[in-house]
Regions:
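The beta1-alpha1 cofactor-binding region of Rossmann-like NAD(H)/NADP(H)-dependent oxidoreductases
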Residues: 61-72, 104
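Active-site helix of classical SDR
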Residues: 122, 157
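SDR active-site lid
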Residues: 174-238
Length: 266
C-alpha cells in the first residue's frame, strides 16, 4: 500500500464500541478515517477527537438498512478523498429471544442489518478497493461457531458473515484485495442494552462475565493488525479461542457450559 497518510479507511458502526476504537487506531497509524453510523452527533464527537489529535476524519451518516444510503456514502468518500483503501463492515446489532418467541419481523431485521447491510457495504466498496489493492474487514463473532440460546438470530447472522468472508476470499483471488473475517469474544459494547426495536435501555445489566470482557481499545489494536496482515480468519480474546476450540472437539461439553450460562433478555 502507499503511505498511510494517503490511505482512506471507511468504518461503519463507528459511533461507539469497537467501531469507534478502530477509528482512533487507524487514525493513530496515519490513515484518513471515514466514519459512518446513524447517530451523526456521536460521529461528530469521534471526528472531533481524531482531528484534535492531528488526524483527518470525515463524517458520513449512513443507515446500513438502506442500500441507497450505502451507495451514496461510497460516492461521497470518492468525491471527498478520491480513493478507498480499507472498508470495515462493523455496523450491526443483536435481536434477542428464543426460537419459539422470535417473529418473522425479528428475523428479517436481524438478517437485513447484520448480513444484507454488510454484504451491500462490501458490494459498493469493492470497485474502489480493486484500484488500491485494498483490504476488507468483516466483523463477525465467536457466536458464529457456537450454540446461541436466546441469540439464535444473532448467531445465524454471524455464521452468515463467516460464510460471506470465505466466499470473498475465493472470489477476490488475483484481484489484490484481501478479506479478513474477525470473530471477537466478549468485548465492551451496547449490544445487550438495545432491544429488538432498536431502543436503548441503559439500565439493563450485561449478562456476560465481566472478568472476560475486553476493552474496545485492546480489541481494536488486534483487529487492525489482523487486517493489515491480510489474515483470512481471526478469532480473538483468549476465552473466545477456547470456546471455539471446545466447540470443535468437545461439542457436548460446550453445549453443557452454555446451557448453564446467563442468557440475555429479549
Amino acid at each position: 500500500m502507499t503511505n498511510p497518510q494517503e490511505n482512506v479507511v471507511w468504518i461503519t458502526g463507528a459511533s461507539s464500541g469497537i467501531g469507534k476504537s478502530m477509528a482512533f487506531e487507524w487514525a493513530r497509524l496515519g490513515y484518513k478515517v471515514v466514519l459512518s453510523s446513524r447517530r451523526k452527533e456521536l460521529l461528530e464527537k469521534v471526528a472531533g477527537d481524531i482531528r484534535h489529535s492531528g488526524g483527518a476524519a470525515l463524517v458520513i451518516p449512513c443507515d446500513i438498512l438502506e442500500e441507497t444510503a450505502i451507495e451514496n456514502a461510497v460516492q461521497q468518500i470518492i468525491l471527498a478523498w478520491g480513493r478507498l483503501d480499507v472498508v470495515i463492515a462493523n455496523a450491526g446489532f443483536g435481536v434477542f429471544g428464543n426460537m419459539e418467541k422470535l417473529t418473522a419481523k425479528d428475523w428479517n431485521r436481524q438478517l437485513q442489518g447484520n448480513v444484507t447491510g454488510l454484504a451491500i457495504t462490501v458490494k459498493y466498496a469493492l470497485p474502489h478497493l480493486k484500484k488500491t489493492n485494498g483490504r476488507i474487514g468483516l466483523v463477525g463473532s465467536v457466536g458464529a461457531y457456537l450454540p446461541n440460546p436466546n441469540l439464535g438470530a444473532y448467531g445465524a447472522s454471524k455464521a452468515a458473515v463467516h460464510s460471506i468472508g470465505q466466499t470473498l476470499q475465493v472470489e477476490l483471488l488475483g484481484t489484490g484485495v484481501s478479506c479478513t473475517t474477525l470473530h471477537p469474544g466478549f468485548v465492551v459494547s451496547e449490544i445487550t442494552r438495545i432491544d429488538n426495536n432498536g431502543v436503548w435501555h441503559p439500565e439493563r445489566p450485561d449478562p456476560r462475565p465481566s472478568n472476560l470482557i475486553w476493552p474496545t481499545d485492546k480489541a481494536a489494536k488486534v483487529m487492525v493488525k489482523a487486517i493489515l496482515k491480510r489474515r483470512r480468519n481471526y478469532v480473538f480474546t483468549t476465552h473466545g479461542k477456547i470456546f471455539v476450540w471446545l466447540q470443535r472437539w468437545f461439542p457436548g461439553l460446550m453445549r453443557f457450559i452454555i446451557s448453564k450460562s446467563p442468557k440475555p433478555d429479549s
